[in-house]
């Protein structure tokens, strides 16, 4: 089991902003997963990978694929208090779910 977090590279997030957005995405998708999935993922070490996304539209396309696969996912919008405009889509988390299922959604993306 794993979770993939896709962070946008086209909006110039600083390292701290990137870390916060990835964390928001991870926790949000985790909360949407079923109890069994959460427990299994926790028991297996909560494997995660952070991947590069190139646009808002790409994140929404990936979210649609995750939805069709029945995978928990979360799209994160920034509050706009620091670097970005309010409502800017920054990240997408896919999973936790089986590795092969997550890979069907995010397998073509590069590591961040």
From Swiss-Prot:
Catalytic EC class: hydrolase
Keywords on record: Cytoplasm, Hydrolase
Keyword Ribosomal protein: no
EC number: 3.1.1.29
GO cellular component: cytosol
InterPro entries referenced in this protein's UniProt entry, alphabetically: Pep_tRNA_hydro_II_dom_sf, Pept_tRNA_hydro_arch, PTH2
BP-aspect Gene Ontology terms: translation
Entry keyword annotation includes Cytoplasm: yes
Compartments it resides in: Cytoplasm
Chain's role: The natural substrate for this enzyme may be peptidyl-tRNAs which drop off the ribosome during protein synthesis.
Family recorded in the similarity comment: Belongs to the PTH2 family.
Annotated PANTHER family: PEPTIDYL-TRNA HYDROLASE 2 (PTHR12649), PEPTIDYL-TRNA HYDROLASE 2, MITOCHONDRIAL (PTHR12649:SF11)
Name of the protein in question: Peptidyl-tRNA hydrolase
Native source species: Halorubrum lacusprofundi (strain ATCC 49239 / DSM 5036 / JCM 8891 / ACAM 34)
